[in-house]
């Protein structure tokens, strides 16, 4: 039985962590490729 608090913390942190990784990867991709210069 998983504690509701722990389950809530995990469900709250996982999307934020994935979003942070995606944003950092997207920023490196945009910075690395100067060909696609879109605003």
Swiss-Prot record:
| GO terms of molecular function | electron transporter, transferring electrons within cytochrome b6/f complex of photosystem II activity
What Pfam family is a match, any one?
Answer: PetG
- Which topology term describes how it sits in the membrane? Single-pass membrane protein
- Please provide the Gene Ontology terms (biological process) for this protein: cytochrome complex assembly; photosynthesis
Instruction: Give an example GO cellular component term for this record.
Output: plasma membrane-derived thylakoid membrane
Q: Which InterPro entries match?
A: Cyt_6/f_cplx_su5, Cyt_6/f_cplx_su5_sf
Q: Which domain of life is it from?
A: Bacteria
Which SUPFAM superfamilies does the annotation name? Answer: PetG subunit of the cytochrome b6f complex
Q: Which keywords does this Swiss-Prot/TrEMBL entry list?
A: Electron transport, Membrane, Photosynthesis, Thylakoid, Transmembrane, Transmembrane helix, Transport
- What parts of the sequence cross the membrane? 5-25
Where in the cell is the protein located?
Cellular thylakoid membrane
**Its family?**
Belongs to the PetG family.
- Self-association and partners: The 4 large subunits of the cytochrome b6-f complex are cytochrome b6, subunit IV (17 kDa polypeptide, PetD), cytochrome f and the Rieske protein, while the 4 small subunits are PetG, PetL, PetM and PetN. The complex functions as a dimer.
- What is the stated purpose of this protein? Component of the cytochrome b6-f complex, which mediates electron transfer between photosystem II (PSII) and photosystem I (PSI), cyclic electron flow around PSI, and state transitions. PetG is required for either the stability or assembly of the cytochrome b6-f complex.
Q: What is this protein called?
A: Cytochrome b6-f complex subunit 5
Species assigned in the record? Prochlorococcus marinus (strain MIT 9515)
